[in-house]
């Protein structure tokens, strides 16, 4: 499904003033009908007084870099974009299946509780209140998903811990809402999958007879020494997976890289021994 930006939106301020005028007029008609005992005036004034609040439901306010996906009786009507005060069909419903989903990212950080799990679903209730208002607007800003550290085996079978930060944004609101069940959860899962797929190709440090490019020739690629190349491959794989969800992956960066604690001491000793051997070779040469 392709995004359709609404072009027939109306000025919200003008429509609000019009509805206020009509509501005041309806009250005046109702009063006049009651005073002069005019049944038609009473009926007209009563009807508009009872339903005159409905058009106010169509008033929408958008901040910069926000969008609102609207449906009418289940059919996709279009996407409201650009900041401003607008009026649309009051029976239109805003749709955002990821509105309650909180990722460990900029834009979703709540009160500094960034140490929580990568994916936390809001319960919709808070202490002292029976329900919480859910904002159905979709942010078009660049956001950073800070993926938690994962333990993954490199191509030599050594367990390493690695974490990445992914900069992303929504580019097609219709695809994000209708092509996947929850685009935030989908992005998080694809980041985990891409990270595992790429890390398994590389050794932690440079190792002999290892082909990381897939051309059949051994190279010196490694997680520690080729971090930018590894991050680029992770970004490309994530982008390939989330393109159908209307998301753009701007950049991926490795934020943490280390051997897993259970082998860290052993690998450190091995690195030290290798460094001593290399130093002796240089002295001999």
Language-model features and meaning:
Residues 53-66:
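Aromatic-capped interface at the extracytoplasmic side
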Residues 1-20:
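N-terminal membrane-targeting/pre-transmembrane regions
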Residues 28-50:
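Hydrophobic alpha-helical transmembrane segments
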